[in-house]
Amino acid sequence: MKITHHCLVSLLSILLLSGFAFSHHISLDEFESHPSTSRALLQAKATCKEDFAAKNYTIITSKCKGPNYPAKVCCSAFKDFACPFAEVLNDEKTDCASTMFSYINLYGRYPPGIFANMCKEGKEGLDCTDVTPTSSSHASIPLVSTHVLLITVSILFHLF
């Protein structure tokens, strides 16, 4: 999957225009896995326009470490990373949430469902009102081939 200059300009325009209307919560539904049904072709999700392959996940992986995975530290780091993307993560018509979690698990090698089980703040999901966007969650990962990562995540996603 190659990102063209036109796609990048379109993505940046959309992000710029939607920056003022982002959600202040990450829905709990995005943490849960949804079983596939026989109508999978009719329910296919659109590809996420946010390039989660190029994000810097060290904001999570440098703070949330095993074997104990302290909930307060891990959830805070997760919110710092994910809250700037709350609007796209809550869009159930796209695969943004599953894509982001695939990369988080790829880089952090976290146990399945760790953030879903630990990070709960209410019926609307995680509250992002107290999280300020940082440039680190939007930074690119240097020296890593996006194509190799995309293939790896695709293989892992299909295996599990």
From Swiss-Prot:
Domain of life: Eukaryota
Lipid-bearing positions (GPI-anchor amidated serine): S137
InterPro entries on file: LORELEI-like
Residue ranges listed under propeptide: 138-160
GO terms classed as biological process: positive regulation of reactive oxygen species biosynthetic process; protein localization to plasma membrane; regulation of pollen tube growth
Annotated compartments: Cell membrane
Annotated protein name in UniProt: GPI-anchored protein LLG3
Organism: Arabidopsis thaliana (Mouse-ear cress)
